Amino acid sequence: MLFITGDCHGNFERFNPSIFPEQKEMTKEDYVIICGDFGGVWHKDEESPEETMVLDWLDSRPFTTLFVCGNHENFDRLYQYPVEDWHGGKVHKIRDSVLHLMRGQVFEIEEKKIFSFGGASSHDIQGGVLEPDDPEFEKKYATLSRGYLPFRINHWSWWKQELPSEEEMEEGRQNLEKHDNKVDFIVTHS
């Protein structure tokens, strides 16, 4: 079985058995794909105790959790996880059954070809992106905090990697060509 859901932003309540009873019949060979803004890897520098608890809980579900990146991910941390080959494409292995489907990959899952290409441009930064090492950071932060425009802080709540790199786009093109530019599904974030 293959299930697809949208943004979690670190809230995985929807995977409780009382809300998602279908999992009672699922195994690790069944998959739930989160279409970006996973949010399970968010704490600034290292895995927090809360993240450990949540990621271990996801890993204990009877299914395998897969996700593509959105625009609200901690890319500094996400890219530190080991890269492995899985079902024909590259993943970051967060836990044994919690995997980040990297951009530009073609996976064969449930006899279907799935092209993954996560990421998106943030829409919630009208106030701008602050640089934490800016000498005026505290002043700018205080000013923006009193205002009504949403803002982000570079490498705290915003990363330029929210958008794909040229290398990721080229790898995606090459992987699609290997499959004659034919896949069954495209999983992305919007």
Question: Where are each of the predicted segments found?
Answer:
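Core catalytic region of metal-dependent phosphoesterases/phosphodiesterases
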Residues: 5, 10-109
